[in-house]
């Protein structure tokens, strides 16, 4: 995915170099904040996995080690049920990390924000814009806290971004295949990791015998 991200960065840099008009992010995107899950309801395994700030990595959502639940809380809004292709932003700790959801049955925890573009087709554009070093630097500069940094969703939405609607839509259309390739690659990696975790213990225990396989 590094090569894909680099290709996207080149395109974004080209866009940023020619667009002089700026708008606040709030004019093109909203954030959905996560639900405050109760730790007493957590299970070692379950139908749903809860995505916290530690699961938001640069460019992906890693659900490894996520707490689980079997039943959805009654007070939780449906927009906290994550869909493949959703983009999340970390608001605490290593603030400003942005990743794409590539699995089903994931739930949005508090201090993680989900992107809700005013125009859905702008999502690839917004993902790569938020991944751009200049925007991440801005987010880090407004984060507050001593022991742990916290990023305000409201202040983040007040940040300015170079934006011209027609050009942004055109760029988003070009970036969309790269965005989809990243999702596909991450899904393949998740599948391979799952197979490894399932097969390796069986190989180590001798449950699976590969001695007769000729290479």
Where do the language-model regions lie?
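Non-catalytic DNA-recognition/assembly elements of restriction-modification systems
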Residues: 1-36, 162, 166-211
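Sequence-specific dsDNA recognition surfaces
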Residues: 26-41, 54-84, 103
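A generic structural signal for short beta-strands and their flanking turns/coil linkers
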Residues: 47, 65, 109-111
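A short beta-sheet element
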Residues: 52-53, 70-73, 78-135, 144-147, ...
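Flexible, active-site-proximal loop/turn residues at the rims of small-molecule/cofactor binding pockets
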Residues: 57, 94, 165
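A structural supersecondary motif
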Residues: 138-140
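Amphipathic heptad-repeat alpha-helical coiled-coil/stalk segments that mediate oligomerization
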Residues: 214-215
